[in-house]
Amino acid sequence: MKSLNIIFAGTPDFAAQHLQAILNSQHNVIAVYTQSDKPAGRGKKLQASPVKQLAEQNNIPVYQPKSLRKEEAQSELKALNADVMVVVAYGLILPKAVLDAPRLGCLNVHGSILPRWRGAAPIQRSIWAGDVQTGVTIMQMDEGLDTGDMLHKVYCDILPTETSTSLYNKLAELAPSVLIDVLDNLENSKFIAEKQDGSQSNYAEKLSKEEAQLDWSLPAMQLERNIRAFNPWPIAYFSTEDKDGNAQTLKVYQAEVLPHQDKPAGTILSADKNGIQIATVDGVLNLLQLQPAGKKPMSAQDLLNGRAEWFTIGKVLA
């Protein structure tokens, strides 16, 4: 089993966990590519990415080009003479010159079973769509968006209560060992590259704050999935009015689907210790954990203790 000289490209904590796994393996990380330091916190001080922090702790050279399209950046990368480049949530597009620079090309760790969800938000979209299974795909990168040949896939279940946070953590635990298995066997025939069937693919579009607004004209089951998919960001929300007619926005962290009823969508059916029940187009969404502006998330009962007038029975929410 040959030790590989690896360029690692990644930015968030999810990527840092993969970098740590490679550092713990027999392979050598000769350089790290990550996005530019970003302002963070109240003071808006520049903060290094988790990947950069880990690289610096291990005395690995760090490169932070704003783009890899320029010839200078491409020449710099090629001069590293890497065996392979591993890309995990890097955030920059890799042009063909970069894809071709390492001897064995570029590998990507993708947070779904391809080709089901290509694009930026595969973890969130798998919950949003009601998938019962997802996993991790290690892919040989090409110029397309997550269209490369698949080297290895490992599956995991999506539980009925799964949020994007919990599924992210599950995949972050699963994926690094899958990556190391591929790297260990990259130059033998253990993993045979498999072409993707593009007709089976969907685009996992980024989430937006606009999409997170609960639309009571949607099915209750879809709204419940939205609440789980949009946690930890952007968090599903809706608005009601207080006794003075002022709009009050509430974020929703947990809900359940109850049987069908015949009231117009958006009607508040009940509000008590068991939850705040709101009619949807085909059923009832029972809101269990909510967060008013400026407060921490709380149970429906705790919310109603001080704000029951926000949820008058029969009121129709927009």
Swiss-Prot record:
GO cellular component: cytosol
Residues binding (6S)-5,6,7,8-tetrahydrofolate: 112-115
PANTHER family assigned: METHIONYL-TRNA FORMYLTRANSFERASE, METHIONYL-TRNA FORMYLTRANSFERASE, MITOCHONDRIAL
Pfam families recorded: Formyl_trans_C, Formyl_trans_N
Keyword annotations of the record: Protein biosynthesis, Transferase
GO molecular function, one term: methionyl-tRNA formyltransferase activity
Entry-linked InterPro entries: Fmt (IPR005794), Formyl_trans_C (IPR005793), Formyl_trans_C_sf (IPR037022), Formyl_transf_N (IPR002376), Formyl_transf_N_sf (IPR036477), Formyl_transferase-like_C_sf (IPR011034), GART_AS (IPR001555), Met-tRNA-FMT_C (IPR044135)
Protein name as catalogued: Methionyl-tRNA formyltransferase
